[in-house]
């Protein structure tokens, strides 16, 4: 049986970056759990902001820098920065640390694997045809410059009695080539028939290494 490696983990430090750029041997467990809680708070608060990734930095034990990568930064920043100020204050009160919150705009959400996966999940939950949604996502990604894309959905598709997996592939997807820039995202759609899992791989070209 073939063994699958996580596309991001396989390329960390080469074509992919870490989502947390700190190390603390003494408080590693505490910080790791806190990072996940910080991400959960932000994503739940701004579910409509198209957040792809939250990178967390810890310059010291008292300060946390959260870099939010979003397709709709205006929702997070708010009018005259009111929303982002409120978020910073909420995080500081909850975690008892000083926070710096930065927002980076995702220019092309059509080629961001996490956002594509979440968009497909959202459309499936609204009872759209999974085949139509997948084909449209592939068309949009290729139109925006993706070299290749694969979308996989698993579960009781269209209310079928037996769960199955279906996927579509367009273009190239060299998963075994370490210099390939592969973006990977996952999401879940909760339907009345059960959970449907979505996985998205997007090939963006090769890095010069």
Swiss-Prot record:
UniProt xrefs under InterPro entries: KH_dom (IPR004087), KH_dom-like_a/b (IPR015946), KH_dom_type_2 (IPR004044), KH_sf_prok-type (IPR009019), Ribosomal_S3_C_sf (IPR036419), Ribosomal_uS3_bac-typ (IPR005704), Ribosomal_uS3_C (IPR001351), Ribosomal_uS3_CS (IPR018280)
Domain KH type-2: 38-107
Keyword terms, alphabetized: Ribonucleoprotein, Ribosomal protein, RNA-binding, rRNA-binding
Family from the record: Belongs to the universal ribosomal protein uS3 family.
Protein name in the entry: Small ribosomal subunit protein uS3
Superkingdom assignment: Bacteria
Protein's organism: Thermosipho africanus (strain TCF52B)
Function: Binds the lower part of the 30S subunit head. Binds mRNA in the 70S ribosome, positioning it for translation.
GO cellular component terms listed in the entry, alphabetical order: cytosolic small ribosomal subunit
GO BP annotation list: translation
Assembly with partners or alone: Part of the 30S ribosomal subunit. Forms a tight complex with proteins S10 and S14.
Any coiled-coil regions, as ranges: none
Gene, per the UniProt record: rpsC
A single GO molecular function term of this UniProt record: structural constituent of ribosome
